[in-house]
Amino acid sequence: MILELIERLFSRSGKNSGEDARRRLKLVIANDRSGLSPEMMEEMRREIVEVVSRYVEIDPGEMEFSLESDQRMTALIANLPVRRVRRTKAKSEAQES
């Protein structure tokens, strides 16, 4: 997750550099306002994926997590593409023990 974020932040794309800089600045501000360390963000991402995976099969290669912030609040945006809905709830590793 962190490596994907860094690649997205610093990758060269067809967009102009002003748009890239604005997007990076928004992400930095949102991270700062949230008070979440990169380690906490990664742990939260892992737990969200674990819980959602009990009910649906998700495409891990296409997942996106981001923080968006305005003057009033910070929002965690999770985009988890669903491959299929599970017929029964999958057991988590904690439940299997």
Swiss-Prot record:
Coiled-coil intervals, chain numbering: none
KW Protein biosynthesis (keyword) present: no
Pfam family membership, one: MinE
Any one GO BP annotation for this protein: regulation of division septum assembly
GO cellular component labels: plasma membrane
Superkingdom per UniProt: Bacteria
InterPro entries: MinE, MinE_sf
Keywords: Cell cycle, Cell division
Cross-referenced SUPFAM superfamilies: Cell division protein MinE topological specificity domain (SSF55229)
Cross-referenced HAMAP family: MinE
Job of this protein: Prevents the cell division inhibition by proteins MinC and MinD at internal division sites while permitting inhibition at polar sites. This ensures cell division at the proper site by restricting the formation of a division septum at the midpoint of the long axis of the cell.
Alphabetical list of NCBIfam families matching this protein: minE
Family designation: Belongs to the MinE family.
Record-given protein name: Putative cell division topological specificity factor
Organism whose genome encodes this protein: Synechocystis sp. (strain ATCC 27184 / PCC 6803 / Kazusa)
Source organism phylogeny: Bacteria, Bacillati, Cyanobacteriota, Cyanophyceae, Synechococcales
The encoding gene: minE
